């Protein structure tokens, strides 16, 4: 077991650390903004006038992405349903609205091909340093498991990660069962596991699962985005192994 120091707090007897992906390890703000804008344009081409309010619902306003907004923190399924609700308000049937939403998001993502957002500064170094200890490392993301695995493969993180888990069914953050499932997959107890994430959902999920601790990271100094965190950091280098 390992002690992890973040700021003035030390988490003791840690066996595993679970990281969120978007906004935590992956600098995905620009990519997600482009996905939101492309999706809104595709839907607006079919239903004129819906584009701008839909873009705001996605969390994009004035060309800027709200890092606590829908497309930044919600699962793919939640994003599909939210977009479908806006479409349904125009008089379309629910199942048709869902289909339009799903197909538009698919088309938007495919238009960017196999593009992956870059790692945040310090992410690779941190994972390398943590992996040489006895810690087990994993990703628990609101993205799909396929997207998580693609991210791990693209950035060549397989040597450091024992788990790449996303949201594929009805469970989504902040449901603590996601965290419990991830811990079970790693073979560790939640009480010996840390969660590192950039959203309130990450913090609530881990807290309700009785995690050892919750580390909130905000690259832009917005502590309210990680309300409930035991400690808030502004860069990954602040996560250190206590020697």
Task: Label each residue range with its predicted role.
Residues 70, 112-114, 166, 189-190:
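Short, contiguous strand/loop micro-motifs
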Residues 52-108, 124, 128-129:
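A metal-dependent, Asp-based hydrolase signature
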